[in-house]
């Protein structure tokens, strides 16, 4: 039951599960009436959910908080696509930062994503996040009017032995 689920927080405030679930990573997000939860074993997970509402200042917000290349991309989209483009990038960035444990205060401009309209991927990031290739991202459409993203850090491959 919810009363007996050992929900804890690490030193940065990132949620985690206590024993006997301490080998399972967890993360959650809510927006409006929506809630998403991510669980993972042997990976760090992060998830974000956002209501896809009007964002008349999407391009200006991207210019202020995102990597310059992402702001350029949003501005190159048709005006009516700005809110969706902005929200997809925001969700993916927040999911990566939540998985890593830094959160938004780390800086949304310290990671750069590419969105081809179908898939999104991390192409560059601050070394504190590891290498871009260590991260996987999946965009979600959990319900009409919502956009989400799930990020997980792949386990490091074991070194080759001779």
Language model feature labels by segment:
Residues 1-162:
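Core catalytic alpha/beta fold that binds nucleotide/phospho-ligands
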């Amino acid at each position: 039951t919810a009363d007996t689920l050992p929900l804890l927080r690490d030193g940065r405030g990132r949620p985690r599960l206590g024993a006997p679930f301490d080998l399972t990573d967890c993360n959650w997000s809510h927006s409006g009436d929506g809630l998403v939860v991510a669980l993972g074993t042997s990976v760090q997970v992060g998830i974000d959910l956002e209501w896809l509402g009007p964002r008349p200042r999407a391009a200006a917000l991207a210019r202020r908080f995102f990597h310059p290349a992402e702001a350029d991309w949003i501005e190159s989209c048709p005006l009516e696509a700005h809110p969706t483009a902005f929200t997809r990038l925001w969700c993916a960035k927040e999911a990566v930062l939540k998985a890593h444990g830094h959160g938004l205060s780390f800086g949304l401009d310290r990671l750069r994503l590419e969105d081809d309209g179908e898939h999104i991927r991390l192409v560059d990031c601050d070394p504190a996040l590891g290498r871009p290739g260590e991260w996987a991202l999946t965009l979600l459409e959990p319900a009409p009017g919502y956009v989400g993203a799930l990020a997980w850090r792949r386990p490091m491959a074991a070194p080759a032995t001779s």
